[in-house]
Amino acid sequence: MHRQSVVRLSRQLGAFPLVELPPPYLAPSLHFPLNRSSVQTSNFSSTAPAAGHGKDLNKSRAVSAIHRTGPRFKLGASKYPLPKPVSPEKLEKRESTPDHGLWGFFPKDRSALSTPEYDNAHGRSWSIQELREKSWEDLHSLWWVCLKEKNRIATSNLERKRLKAGYGEWEANQRLRTIRVTQLNIKHVLRERWYAWEDAQNLYKKGYRPQNEDTEESA
């Protein structure tokens, strides 16, 4: 049966009972709803098509401190006066501080890059026996001298890498190795003193007194 005739009969007779309908595989059009809903379905996006054509009243739109994004339109800088550049000849000459602490990151001649002769002019590292005779203040001062020298070598290596000088790297590494051996020996001596102090503390807790041995020897 043609679909138009089915629609005409359904309007005249109302609706077909489900009992009088043939099976769906014989007449599938009879089992579909004939009266479709007049409700309009929305698209995938519920935003109006003309929403982006109007003026954006949100001043903070697209402003993100994380992504460093600014507003969607250019802003004028006429509200704040811009500083005018000053000629270098009119600037006051500032004298550098001769004893500034940052000069410790550079060689004695205050050059940006140390020469291989300067890095190669060093002695041997401090031995453990020599460091055992030093006081705590001497070890502390020597440690900071080594640390300061390591920072100076790191500054020269960074400048050498930036300039692509191609020389002085081997001499700087040899000097750095000597400094590291000295620092390892300082740690070894301090570790020995810590263990000695810990053993003396344990003996004192057990009742050991050095003056008792002196009394027994004199008797």
Swiss-Prot record:
* Ranges annotated as biased composition (Basic and acidic residues): 87-97
> What's the chief localization of this chain?
mitochondrion
A single GO BP term for this record reads: mitochondrial translation
User: What subcellular locations does the record give?
Assistant: Mitochondrion
List the GO cellular component terms.
mitochondrial large ribosomal subunit
Which InterPro entries does this entry report, sorted A to Z? Answer: MRP-L47_sf, Ribosomal_uL29_mit
Where are the residues of the annotated region Disordered? Answer: 77-97
The alphabetical list of record keywords is:
Mitochondrion, Ribonucleoprotein, Ribosomal protein, Transit peptide
Q: Which GO terms describe its molecular function?
A: structural constituent of ribosome
Per UniProt, what is one Pfam family of this protein?
MRP-L47
Q: Please give the positions of the paired cysteines in each disulfide bond.
A: none
Highest taxon listed in the record's lineage: Eukaryota
Subunit structure of this entry?
Component of the mitochondrial large ribosomal subunit. Mature mitochondrial ribosomes consist of a small (37S) and a large (54S) subunit. The 37S subunit contains at least 33 different proteins and 1 molecule of RNA (15S). The 54S subunit contains at least 45 different proteins and 1 molecule of RNA (21S).
Protein family per UniProt: Belongs to the universal ribosomal protein uL29 family.
> What is the name of the protein in this document?
Large ribosomal subunit protein uL29m
- What is the species listed in this Swiss-Prot or TrEMBL entry? Emericella nidulans (strain FGSC A4 / ATCC 38163 / CBS 112.46 / NRRL 194 / M139) (Aspergillus nidulans)
Protein's gene: mrpl4
